[in-house]
Amino acid sequence: MPMINLLLLILPTLIAMAFLMLTERKILGYTQLRKGPNIVGPYGLLQPFADAMKLFTKEPLKPSTSTTALYIIAPTLALTIALLLWTPLPMPNPLINLNLGLLFILATSSLTVYSILWSGWASNSNYALIGALRAVAQTISYEVTSAIILLSVLLMSGSFNLSTLITTQEHIWLLLPTWPLAMMWFISTLAETNRTPFDLTEGESELVSGFNTEYAAGPFALFFMAEYVNIIMMNALTTMIFLGTTHNAHRPELYTTCFTIKTLLLTSLFLWIRTTYPRFRYDQLMYLLWKNFLPLTLTLLMWYISLSTMIASIPPQT
């Protein structure tokens, strides 16, 4: 039974990821006044499966000077971690109900840094290594603000358990009282998933393709898949934290439907941002975090701590 549950989580996630790639290519096409993929299958719907077949049947070439073990482990680890992050998410029931669900997600998402660093180092290429070092610095930096934002939300929720957030938001979305945090969280998720305008790790104009420059065929596809699975996961987490859906035990399908619609809308916003904004300079990216986001999130954290203390210590009114 647990095996079936696991498959029912992994397979839809991978199918959603495949169609997200197609949607992105379609949106990019229409914003540039062209059609996008429309040959393979009706309206191009089978394009992601054709791409997967092509990539996984090609010979996985690797540089002769690369470190073989790490070179192969890195993309596999990236996709494994991306799929592992889905296990504590309540939709409305999680696969594994963890008391420290949010802490688990924060800790596990940090491990993605290792796969990127290993891939850059094991490739034995200067471009790949520079891209990997950029990715590590960027991800670690933005996780600082993400952790502080989550801590502020936890003070209002009262628990690290993700299911508690559903109860917390029965009457009002946390987006409304904490909108500055929500805006900063959304930008941090863009940076953590290395998406435009924060895709400095694969700056084509200066680093060829970044940390995955030396990858081809199957291993390259695994990195690509991990990126898109992470995008959907981060938007699902944003939906749970700030746009909570009321869970009716008698009609659980309503929760799943609302949750899916909100996640898809946020994911579409990710794609829209890619078509609209240019890439930041690296110093601007770091300046935004350390000089703007960090002081703001710390100030708001102190505000939410003092607010809850003030409200709790008001004497009862007769």
From Swiss-Prot:
It is found in: Mitochondrion inner membrane. InterPro entries: NADH_UbQ_OxRdtase_su1/FPO (IPR001694), NADH_UbQ_OxRdtase_su1_CS (IPR018086). GO terms for biological process: mitochondrial electron transport, NADH to ubiquinone; mitochondrial respiratory chain complex I assembly. The chain crosses the membrane at residues 2-22, 69-89, 100-120, 147-167, 171-191, 222-242, 253-273, 294-314. Its EC number is 7.1.1.2. Keywords: Electron transport, Membrane, Mitochondrion, Mitochondrion inner membrane, NAD, Respiratory chain, Translocase, Transmembrane, Transmembrane helix, Transport, Ubiquinone. It is an enzyme of class 7 (translocase). It is a multi-pass membrane protein. PROSITE patterns: COMPLEX1_ND1_1, COMPLEX1_ND1_2. Its main location: mitochondrion. GO terms for cellular component: mitochondrial inner membrane. It catalyses: a ubiquinone + NADH + 5 H(+)(in) = a ubiquinol + NAD(+) + 4 H(+)(out). Disulfide bonds: none annotated. One of its GO terms (molecular function) is NADH dehydrogenase (ubiquinone) activity. HAMAP family: NDH1_NuoH (MF_01350). Core subunit of the mitochondrial membrane respiratory chain NADH dehydrogenase (Complex I) which catalyzes electron transfer from NADH through the respiratory chain, using ubiquinone as an electron acceptor. Essential for the catalytic activity and assembly of complex I. Belongs to the complex I subunit 1 family. Core subunit of respiratory chain NADH dehydrogenase (Complex I) which is composed of 45 different subunits. This is NADH-ubiquinone oxidoreductase chain 1. It comes from Hylobates lar (Lar gibbon).
